[in-house]
Amino acid sequence: MSIIISKTVKQELPEEKIRKAIELVLQGEKCEAEEISAVYCGDRLIRKINIEHLAHDYPTDTISFRLNSGNAIEGEFYISCDTVRRNAQEYESSFENELLRVTIHSVLHLIGFEDQSAAQKAEMTQKENRYLAALFHHDEK
């Protein structure tokens, strides 16, 4: 499995934790991955991607693209560090914690989870919380 982490922003990223978060979700959901590309960018790029692919003229925290339909996931996701920073302040969380939550959320989307309904959102939030707790518990060992 290949995990490619790249960024278009100067923000320092906890790359080891990002990689571990991706691996935890895949293992926990019993999924295999061929290649996952994680791109950490700013609002300008994610807004452009939203306009081109979803007809949304505003930035979002993440956008995920599954690139295949096979068993082993090939996909990419983009996360706006600008939006993550604003959300972290709004939710009274650290930037790193919110970044890892959105990373987990993005991987769940690649696996096929949706968040269109209240029930779907609740399921994804529950999974995000579980994987975040597992990630931080793993760091304490």
From Swiss-Prot:
Annotated InterPro entries: MetalPrtase_cat_dom_sf_prd, YbeY, YbeY_CS
Gene3D superfamilies named among the record's database cross-references: Metalloproteases ('zincins'), catalytic domain (3.40.390.30)
Subcellular location: Cytoplasm
GO process terms (BP): rRNA processing
SUPFAM superfamilies xrefs: Metalloproteases ('zincins'), catalytic domain
Binding site for Zn(2+): 105, 109, 115
Highest taxon in the source lineage: Bacteria
Keywords (A to Z) from UniProt: Cytoplasm, Endonuclease, Hydrolase, Metal-binding, Nuclease, Ribosome biogenesis, rRNA processing, Zinc
Enzyme class: hydrolase
This protein's record includes keyword Metal-binding: yes
The keyword ATP-binding appears for this protein: no
Coiled coil (residue ranges): none
EC number: 3.1.-.-
Similarity comment: family membership: Belongs to the endoribonuclease YbeY family.
Job description of the protein: Single strand-specific metallo-endoribonuclease involved in late-stage 70S ribosome quality control and in maturation of the 3' terminus of the 16S rRNA.
Descriptive protein name: Endoribonuclease YbeY
Gene that this sequence comes from: ybeY
